[in-house]
C-alpha cells in the first residue's frame, strides 16, 4: 500500500500498481503531504511579481518559480541542485515541483467536510443517527448539543437552544457538557464505539417489523461496517487541517495593465486564511463567546465554499456576480478534470481541413495536401535531412523546410511512404469514425477522401471537415496498418454486413449498366468471348442493354482452396452484365451479376466476394466497382425533369371514391350512428387505403413501359424513367418520396403526433394550395425541431451505453457453460422478417440440435454457425436453436469468446482481448443519431398502417394453433376465448413460415392441423372493439343495470334497433357510483349457469363505454357476442417514439400503465370493490390466494373463473421488464428487450446484431438482491455484484455452509454505470460528488479492470494489445527472473538499430 501522493512525488512513473484505494485523509496524513503551512492570504507582490513569503504562492513552501534558481537569486544553475538557500529558504530545484508540492492550513477550530455532511444521504447524519437539520443547527452555531449528560436528566446528542441551555446551566451547573460547532460533532463521532454499535444493530434488525425501519437500520449498519472495514476514523469527516493545492494548479497570471487573471480557488483560499487568522487572534484575546462563535461559523462557511461552493446556502460570487469555481466544480461535469483532461485529451501531430471527393484513389489511400503533410511530418523530415547530410543542424533543416526547397519535397515523399495517417470525422459515433489511410501528396488545400468510406464516416462533401493524426511509434503505425486501415474494415461491426458499399452515383451507374432493354440495337448477337463484347460495344454496334449470347469461362475452387476448375458455357445475358463480369474476382459465379444490380444486390455481391475470395480480392473489386459505376453513371446521362413525375390517370377517381366514403361516414356520425372516435379512425383508414391505391397506380405507371420487340409485338418492360431508375436502384429517393411528388401527399400529422383527418390530395407536381401548404408545414417544422433535440439525446444515450459496457472485454476462450438463449425466427404476420438462419449466424450452438423425427444430432454443441451451416438450416426443418449468449456466459470478469461467437467486423470467432462492450454500445448508439436525423425526410406524411382485421394465409401449409382456448359457435365457426393465442402456418419441412397473433373474440374458419391453400382467409375480427363472448349458453339476466344510473339506451335511426351503453363511473349520478353493471346467464330452471369444471357462476362485468348487444331475458348461444368495448385510437409511428423508447428500455423504466401480470398460477375471482379499485384474487392449487388491487379504468382482460399461468397478462399494457425478469426469468427478459429494441430499429431499416443488445443486457443484470443471507457476509436486502455472490456461494459450498439466496435485479444503464465496482469509472460518468463521497467513506478499491479507469490513470487499456501487456506485466512481477522474451521496447530498439544499419548500407551504395 503506497500513498498515491508519494507515488506521484517520486518522479519515476515506473511504479507498478494494480489497484487504487480512496479513503478519508487523517490530519496527520495531510500534514505529511505538506511542505509547509500557509499562514498569510497574500499571493504575489504586484510590483516585483515575486511570491510573498508564507503566502498562497510562497516559494519556500512550494518550490522555486524559475528552474534551478532561488528566489533572491543567490543560487542559479544546475550545479547548486538540492541546496536550500539560507537567505530566502527556497530549495534549488525544477519549477515543476510547484505543480505537485502541497501546503496546509492549520485550522483554529475543527470544520465539518461539506461532502460528508450535505451529500445525500448525509454520512455524518447517518453515522450519528441524527437528522441533517439537527446537525446543521449544531455546526452553524444555532443550537447546543449535549455531549456528556453526566448525572442530569438530559440525553446524549440532545439539542438545546440558547434559552434551554441557560436553563440547564442554572439547574445542573457544570455536571453536563454541551457544545456547539464542529467540535461537538467531532466529540460525538469519537464517542461512538463501532464494534458495539454494529453488534447492537445486527441484533436489532431481525426484531423489527416495519419495512422502513429495517431499511434505515441496514443502511446505517452498512455505513458502520464500511468504517470498520476500511479503517477510516469517523472523526476524520471533521477536518482540523486543510490541504492547499499546489500553486501551479491554481495559477495567477499577470495581464497587461497591472491586472491579474486568477483561479477562483485563490479567492476561496484567501477567504479561509483570513477568517482562520482572525479566529486565532480572537481566541488569543479571549474574545466574547458570541464573536468567536460567529467567526467559527464564517470559517465553516468559507471552507464549505472552497470544497463545494453553492452546496449550502448561496454560492459565494466573485466580482462579476459569477459563482466561484470550487474544488468540487473542478472535477465534475463536462469541463471538469475527468471528462476534459483525463478521458479526452488534445493531441499534437494533427491537422484539419475540408474534404473533397477522391474518385481516383484506391481504398487504402487518402489525398493529403502537401502543406499539411509538411507540417505534420516535420520532425521526421528534420531527422532525415540531418541524417542525409543536407542540413548540419536542426536549425538549418528548419530553414530548408521553411523555404520549401525541392529536396524537402523529395524527403517528404520518402518519409510519407508507407506511413499511415488517421482520418477522423466528428462526431465519432462508432469505431469506423477513425480509420487509417496511406497519404498521397496532392496540390491544393483540401483532404481527398475515398467515396466508399463516406458511409462509415457518414461524411458528405458539402463542407465537412476532417482531422488528420499521425501515429508516431512503431507499434502505433503497426496497429494503424493492421487494425485501422480502411481496407481492413470492410464489414460493419454492428451487423457484419459490408459497410464499404457503393451508394448514389455508383449504384445508378451499375444498375443502368445491368438493365435490359427489349429491342435494343444489337439484340440477339452472339459473342465468343468478353473481348469481342467490349469491341462491339466500343464501336457502338451493340447497345449496353441489348440481350446477347456470350461464351464465358467460370472458375471454381474446391472447398480446401485447392485446384481451380473451369467450365465454359454460353450465357444468355446483356452486354452490360457481361462487361461487369470482367471485374468480378476469379472464382465467383456469373449469376451473381446476371441481374439488375440494385443497392441490395451490390451489397450482397460484395458480401459474397468477401466470404469466398477473402479480403484482398474484395477491396480490389470494390474499387473496380466504384470506378465502373462512376464511369457509366456519367455515360448514361441520367437526369430528371418535371415530366418524369407521371401522375396516374386513376388518381381522380380514387380520390373521389374516398371522398364519397368519408361523406357516408360523416352522415352516419351526424345521425349518431358512430362515435367521434370511430369516425376519426374510419376516416383515417379510408384515406390511408386511398393513398396506397394512388401510390400503387402511380408506381405501376412509372415503373412499366411498353416496348416493341424484334417480332414487332408490344411487350411490357421495366421503364427507363430516370426517377424510377434512381428509386428502384436505391441510388436516391424512395417510393414514399415519389408518392409525394407524383401521387398524393396523403395524411399529415400535427406537431403532437395526432393525424389530421383531411389529407393533402395534391402532390408536389400539381402544387399545393395555401391550406395544404399550411397543413404540411406542421409536420415539416416538427421534423426539423426534432432533429436538433434528438442529436443531443442520442449522443447522451451512446455515452450511457459506453459507460455501462466499457469494462466488458473478451477475457477467455470458453467458459464451458451449457446455458444459452433459444432463438426463433422473427415472424410478423405472414412474413418471416428475420429468418432463423439470419438470427443464429455467427453464434455458437449451446446444445446439440436434434432432428425431431429421427433424434439424429444435426449440429453438435460448440459449433460456430457460419454461412455454410446457415444455408443448410433452411432444409433441416429446425424451428429453434439454443445458442450461447453473453447473457448466460459464466466468465467472472468479461465474456468468453464462445458465448460471444463471431466478431462481426472480421467474420471469424472473436479474439481474446476484443472490447465487445464498447463495440456493442457504439453499434446501438450510432444509428440512434442517424435515425433521429432522419425524421423529417418524409415531411411529416403520416405513415399509418390500416387496422388489421383478418388473417389471410400467404403461403399454403398446415395450420397450427398455439396456446389457444376456443368455443364452437352454432354456425360451426370457432371463437377464440383466450388471450395470448396465435395461429401459425408451417411449410412441408415443418418450419413455421407465418405467425399471426389472434385477439380474444376472433372467429376462426379453420381448425388445428388443417391444410390451407395460399390466400385463404382463416380468421377475422373487429379491430375497433373488444368483444365479450359467451362461453356457455343461457338466458340473459341484467344485474345493476338501471336506465340513467348505470346505462343509457339510444335508438339507431337507420335500423331502428336500440342499443345499450354503460355509463362510465365518473359520469354516473352519485347513487349509481357503487353499482357494478354485469350480465349473468341463467339455465332453463332459472339457476345460475356455472363455468364448466367449476362452481363459479358466469358473470360478465361490463366496464364503462361498453355497448351491450343483448336484451334482458334474451337467449345467448355459445360463442355469441354479449357486449363490445370500444378500443382507443392509435397514434402515429415515428422514431420520435423510437429513440426515447430505446432509452426507456435500456434505463429499465417502468412504463406508465404497465401490463398487469399474474404473480402465480391459479384461478381468477373478483372480490369486493374499493373506491376506484377492483379486487382480483388468484387462487393457486396449493398455497395462499393472492390479492391484487387493480384501478377501475384498466381494461381487465380475464373473466371470473379463468385459470391463468404465472406471468400471463391480466390487464393489457406495455410490459414492465422488471416483472418479466421476476416472473419469467432472465431468458424471457433478454428476449423481450432484444425484440422491443430491434422493432424500433427495424422500423427505420437499421440492422443491428442481437448480440450487441445482449451484451448491454448482461451489464444491466450485474447486480442481485440478497433475499436470504445464509452464512454469507451479505446483509439481507443488499444489492451485490452477481459475480461476488457466485464466488461467495462457491466458497460457502466448499465449507458446507448455507449459501446466500438472491433475486436477479435489472438496473437501468445509468444506475448500472453508477453501481459499478470501479469508483473511478462511476465518478467520471455522473454524480461525481456522490460517487467519490461514498467511495471515500467505504474505503473502496478500484482494481482497474475496465477501460475507463485505466485511461484515467494513464495506462494502456486492458483490451486488444493492452490485455497482453498487462498479463505480461503481472507475470514479470510474479517472477522477476524470467525476462526471457524481451519487451516491445527492447524489440523496437533492436529493430531500429538493424534498420539504421541497413539504411547506412543503402546510402553507401
Curated annotation (Swiss-Prot):
Its EC number is 2.7.7.6. Residues 1363-1388 are annotated as: Disordered. Its cofactor is Mg(2+); Zn(2+). It catalyses: RNA(n) + a ribonucleoside 5'-triphosphate = RNA(n+1) + diphosphate. Gene3D superfamilies: 1.10.132.30, 1.10.150.390, 1.10.1790.20, 1.10.40.90, 2.40.40.20, 2.40.50.100, RNA polymerase II, clamp domain, RNA polymerase Rpb1, domain 3. Binds 1 Mg(2+) ion per subunit. It comes from the Bacteria. Zn(2+) 1 binds at residues 70, 72, 85, 88. GO terms for cellular component: DNA-directed RNA polymerase complex. Zn(2+) 2 binds at residues 815, 889, 896, 899. Keywords: DNA-directed RNA polymerase, Magnesium, Metal-binding, Nucleotidyltransferase, Transcription, Transferase, Zinc. Mg(2+) binds at residues 460, 462, 464. Pfam families: RNA_pol_Rpb1_1, RNA_pol_Rpb1_2, RNA_pol_Rpb1_3, RNA_pol_Rpb1_4, RNA_pol_Rpb1_5. One of its GO terms (molecular function) is magnesium ion binding. GO terms for biological process: DNA-templated transcription. DNA-dependent RNA polymerase catalyzes the transcription of DNA into RNA using the four ribonucleoside triphosphates as substrates. The RNAP catalytic core consists of 2 alpha, 1 beta, 1 beta' and 1 omega subunit. When a sigma factor is associated with the core the holoenzyme is formed, which can initiate transcription. Belongs to the RNA polymerase beta' chain family. PANTHER family: DNA-DIRECTED RNA POLYMERASE, DNA-DIRECTED RNA POLYMERASE SUBUNIT BETA. This is DNA-directed RNA polymerase subunit beta'.
Amino acid at each position: 500500500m503506497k500513498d498515491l501522493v508519494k507515488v506521484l512525488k517520486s518522479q519515476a512513473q515506473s511504479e507498478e500498481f494494480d489497484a487504487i484505494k480512496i479513503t478519508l485523509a487523517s490530519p496527520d496524513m495531510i500534514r505529511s503531504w505538506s511542505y509547509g503551512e500557509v499562514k498569510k492570504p497574500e499571493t504575489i507582490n504586484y510590483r516585483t511579481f515575486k511570491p510573498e513569503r508564507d503566502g498562497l504562492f510562497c516559494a519556500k513552501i512550494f518550490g522555486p518559480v524559475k528552474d534551478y534558481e532561488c528566489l533572491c537569486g543567490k543560487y542559479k544553475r544546475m550545479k547548486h541542485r538540492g541546496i536550500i538557500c539560507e537567505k530566502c529558504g527556497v530549495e534549488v530545484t525544477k519549477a515543476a515541483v510547484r505543480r505537485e508540492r502541497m501546503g496546509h492550513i492549520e485550522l483554529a477550530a475543527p470544520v465539518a467536510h461539506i461532502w460528508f455532511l450535505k451529500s445525500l444521504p448525509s454520512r455524518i447524519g447517518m453515522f450519528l443517527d441524527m437528522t441533517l437539520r439537527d446537525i446543521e443547527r449544531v455546526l452553524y452555531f444555532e443550537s447546543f448539543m449535549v455531549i456528556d449528560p453526566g448525572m442530569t436528566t438530559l440525553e446524549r446528542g440532545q439539542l438545546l437552544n440558547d434559552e434551554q441551555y441557560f436553563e440547564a446551566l442554572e439547574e445542573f451547573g457544570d455536571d453536563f457538557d454541551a457544545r456547539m460547532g464542529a467540535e461537538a460533532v467531532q466529540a460525538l463521532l469519537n464517542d461512538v464505539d463501532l464494534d458495539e454499535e454494529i453488534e447492537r444493530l445486527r441484533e436489532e434488525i431481525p426484531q423489527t417489523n416495519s419495512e422502513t425501519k429495517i431499511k434505515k437500520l441496514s443502511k446505517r449498519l452498512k455505513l458502520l461496517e464500511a468504517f470498520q472495514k476500511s479503517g477510516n476514523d469517523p472523526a476524520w469527516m471533521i477536518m482540523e487541517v486543510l490541504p492547499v493545492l499546489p500553486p501551479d494548479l491554481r495559477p495567477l497570471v499577470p495581464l497587461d495593465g497591472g491586472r491579474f487573471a486568477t483561479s477562483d480557488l485563490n479567492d476561496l483560499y484567501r477567504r479561509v486564511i483570513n477568517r482562520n487568522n482572525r479566529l486565532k487572534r480572537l481566541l488569543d484575546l479571549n474574545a466574547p463567546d458570541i464573536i468567536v462563535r460567529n467567526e467559527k461559523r464564517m470559517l465553516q462557511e468559507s471552507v464549505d465554499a472552497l470544497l463545494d461552493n453553492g452546496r449550502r446556502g448561496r454560492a459565494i460570487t466573485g466580482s462579476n456576480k459569477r459563482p466561484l469555481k470550487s474544488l468540487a466544480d473542478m472535477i465534475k461535469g463536462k469541463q471538469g478534470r475527468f471528462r476534459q483532461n483525463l478521458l479526452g485529451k488534445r493531441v499534437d501531430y494533427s491537422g484539419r481541413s475540408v474534404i473533397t471527393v477522391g474518385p481516383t484513389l484506391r481504398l487504402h489511400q487518402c489525398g493529403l495536401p502537401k502543406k499539411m503533410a509538411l507540417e505534420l511530418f516535420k520532425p521526421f523530415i528534420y531527422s532525415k535531412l540531418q541524417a542525409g547530410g543536407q542540413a548540419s543542424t536542426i536549425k538549418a533543416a528548419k530553414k530548408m523546410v521553411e523555404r520549401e526547397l525541392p529536396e524537402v519535397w523529395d524527403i517528404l515523399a520518402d518519409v510519407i511512404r508507407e506511413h499511415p495517417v488517421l482520418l477522423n470525422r466528428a462526431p465519432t459515433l462508432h469505431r469506423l469514425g477513425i480509420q487509417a489511410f496511406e497519404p498521397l501528396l496532392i496540390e491544393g488545400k483540401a483532404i481527398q477522401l475515398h467515396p466508399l468510406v463516406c458511409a462509415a464516416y457518414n461524411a458528405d462533401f458539402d463542407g465537412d471537415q476532417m482531422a488528420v493524426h499521425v501515429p508516431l511509434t512503431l507499434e502505433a503505425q503497426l496497429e494503424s496498418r493492421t487494425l485501422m486501415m480502411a481496407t481492413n474494415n470492410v464489414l460493419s461491426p454492428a451487423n457484419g454486413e459490408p459497410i464499404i458499399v457503393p451508394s448514389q452515383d455508383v449504384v445508378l451507374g451499375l444498375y443502368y449498366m445491368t438493365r435490359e432493354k427489349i429491342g435494343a440495337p444489337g439484340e440477339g448477337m452472339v459473342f465468343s468471348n468478353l473481348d469481342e463484347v467490349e469491341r462491339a460495344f466500343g464501336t457502338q454496334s451493340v447497345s449496353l442493354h441489348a440481350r446477347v449470347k456470350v461464351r464465358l469461362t467460370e472458375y471454381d475452387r474446391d472447398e480446401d482452396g485447392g485446384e481451380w476448375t473451369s467450365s465454359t458455357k454460353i450465357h444468355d445475358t446483356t452486354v452490360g452484365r457481361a462487361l461487369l463480369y470482367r471485374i468480378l474476382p476469379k472464382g465467383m459465379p456469373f449469376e451473381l451479376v446476371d441481374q439488375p444490380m440494385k443497392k441490395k444486390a451490390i451489397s450482397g455481391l460484395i458480401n459474397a466476394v468477401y466470404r469466398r475470395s477473402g479480403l484482398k480480392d474484395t477491396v480490389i473489386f470494390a474499387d473496380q466497382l466504384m470506378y465502373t459505376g462512376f464511369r457509366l453513371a456519367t455515360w448514361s446521362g441520367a437526369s430528371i425533369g418535371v415530366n418524369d413525375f407521371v401522375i396516374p390517370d386513376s388518381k381522380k377517381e380514387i380520390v373521389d371514391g374516398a371522398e364519397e366514403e368519408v361523406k357516408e361516414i360523416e352522415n352516419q356520425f351526424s345521425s349518431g350512428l358512430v362515435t367521434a372516435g370511430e369516425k376519426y379512425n374510419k376516416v383515417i383508414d379510408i384515406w390511408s387505403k386511398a393513398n396506397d391505391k394512388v401510390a400503387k397506380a402511380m408506381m405501376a405507371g412509372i415503373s412499366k413501359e411498353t416496348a416493341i420487340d424484334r417480332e414487332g409485338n408490344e411487350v411490357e418492360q421495366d421503364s427507363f424513367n430516370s426517377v424510377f431508375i434512381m428509386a428502384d436502384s436505391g441510388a436516391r429517393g424512395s417510393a414514399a418520396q415519389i408518392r409525394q411528388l407524383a401521387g398524393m401527399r396523403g395524411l399529415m400529422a400535427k406537431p403532437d403526433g395526432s393525424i389530421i383527418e383531411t389529407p393533402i390530395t395534391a402532390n408536389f407536381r400539381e402544387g399545393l394550395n395555401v391550406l395544404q401548404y399550411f397543413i404540411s408545414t406542421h409536420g415539416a417544422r416538427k421534423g426539423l425541431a426534432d432533429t436538433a433535440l434528438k442529436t443531443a439525446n442520442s449522443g447522451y444515450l451512446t455515452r450511457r451505453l459506453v459507460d455501462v459496457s466499457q469494462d466488458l472485454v473478451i477475457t477467455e476462450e470458453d467458459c464451458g457453460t451449457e446455458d444459452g438463449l433459444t432463438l426463433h425466427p422473427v415472424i410478423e404476420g405472414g412474413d418471416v422478417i428475420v429468418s432463423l438462419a439470419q438470427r443464429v449466424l455467427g453464434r455458437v450452438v449451446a446444445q446439440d440440435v436434434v432432428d425431431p423425427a429421427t433424434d439424429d444430432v444435426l449440429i453438435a454443441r460448440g459449433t460456430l454457425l457460419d454461412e455454410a451451416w446457415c444455408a443448410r438450416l433452411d432444409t433441416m426443418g429446425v424451428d429453434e436453436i439454443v445458442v450461447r449468449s453473453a447473457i448466460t456466459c459464466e466468465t467472472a470478469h468479461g465474456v468468453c469468446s464462445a458465448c460471444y461467437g463471431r466478431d462481426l467486423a472480421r467474420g471469424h470467432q472473436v479474439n481474446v482481448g476484443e472490447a465487445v462492450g464498447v463495440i456493442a454500445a457504439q453499434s446501438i448508439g450510432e444509428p440512434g443519431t442517424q435515425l433521429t436525423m432522419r425524421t423529417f425526410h418524409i415531411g411529416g406524411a403520416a405513415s399509418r398502417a390500416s387496422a388489421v382485421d383478418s388473417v389471410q394465409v400467404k403461403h399454403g401449409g398446415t395450420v397450427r394453433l398455439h396456446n389457444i382456448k376456443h368455443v364452437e359457435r352454432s354456425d360451426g365457426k370457432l371463437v377464440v376465448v383466450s388471450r395470448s393465442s396465435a395461429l401459425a402456418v408451417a411449410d412441408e419441412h415443418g418450419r413455421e413460415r407465418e405467425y399471426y397473433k389472434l385477439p380474444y373474440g376472433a372467429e376462426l374458419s379453420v381448425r388445428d392441423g388443417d391444410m390451407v391453400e395460399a390466400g385463404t382467409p382463416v380468421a377475422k375480427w373487429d379491430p375497433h372493439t373488444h368483444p365479450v363472448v359467451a362461453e356457455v349458453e343461457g338466458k340473459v339476466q341484467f344485474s345493476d343495470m338501471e336506465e340513467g344510473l348505470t346505462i343509457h339506451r339510444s335508438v339507431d335511426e337507420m335500423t331502428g334497433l336500440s342499443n345499450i351503453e354503460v355509463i362510465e363511473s365518473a359520469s354516473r349520478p352519485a347513487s349509481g357510483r357503487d353499482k357494478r353493471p354485469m350480465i349473468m346467464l341463467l339455465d332453463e330452471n332459472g339457476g345460475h349457469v356455472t363455468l364448466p369444471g367449476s362452481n363459479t357462476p358466469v358473470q360478465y362485468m361490463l366496464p364503462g363505454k361498453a355497448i351491450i348487444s343483448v336484451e334482458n331475458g334474451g337467449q345467448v348461444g355459445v360463442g355469441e357476442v354479449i357486449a363490445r368495448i370500444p378500443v382507443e385510437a392509435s397514434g402515429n409511428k415515428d422514431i420520435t417514439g423510437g429513440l426515447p423508447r430505446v432509452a426507456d428500455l435500456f434505463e429499465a423504466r417502468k412504463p406508465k400503465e404497465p401490463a398487469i401480470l399474474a404473480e402465480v398460477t391459479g384461478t381468477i375471482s373478483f372480490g369486493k370493490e374499493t373506491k376506484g379499485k377492483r379486487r382480483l384474487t388468484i387462487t393457486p392449487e396449493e398455497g395462499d390466494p393472492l390479492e391484487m388491487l387493480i384501478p377501475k379504468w384498466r381494461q381487465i382482460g380475464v373473466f371470473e373463473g379463468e385459470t391463468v399461468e404465472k406471468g400471463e397478462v391480466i390487464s393489457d399494457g406495455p410490459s414492465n421488464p422488471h416483472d418479466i425478469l421476476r416472473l419469467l426469468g432472465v431468458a424471457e427478459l433478454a428476449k423481450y428487450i432484444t425484440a422491443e429494441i430491434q422493432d424500433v430499429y427495424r422500423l427505420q431499416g437499421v440492422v443491428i446484431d442481437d448480440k450487441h443488445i445482449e451484451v448491454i443486457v448482461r451489464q444491466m443484470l450485474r447486480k442481485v438482491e440478497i433475499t436470504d443471507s445464509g452464512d454469507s457476509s451479505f446483509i439481507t436486502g443488499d444489492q451485490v455484484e452477481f459475480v461476488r455472490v457466485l464466488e461467495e456461494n462457491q466458497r460457502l459450498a466448499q465449507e458446507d455452509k448455507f449459501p446466500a439466496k438472491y433475486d436477479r435485479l435489472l438496473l437501468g444503464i445509468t444506475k448500472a454505470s453508477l453501481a459499478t465496482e470501479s469508483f473511478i469509472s462511476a465518478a467520471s460518468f455522473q454524480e461525481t460528488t456522490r460517487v467519490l463521497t461514498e467511495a471515500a467513506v467505504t474505503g473502496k478499491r478500484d482494481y482497474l479492470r475496465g477501460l475507463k479507469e485505466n485511461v484515467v490513470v494513464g495506462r494502456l487499456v486492458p483490451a486488444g494489445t493492452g490485455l497482453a501487456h498487462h498479463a505480461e506485466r503481472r507475470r514479470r512481477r510474479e517472477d522477476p527472473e524470467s525476462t526471457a522474451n524481451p519487451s516491445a521496447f527492447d524489440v523496437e530498439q533492436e529493430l531500429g538499430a538493424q534498420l539504421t544499419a541497413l539504411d547506412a548500407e543503402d546510402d553507401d551504395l
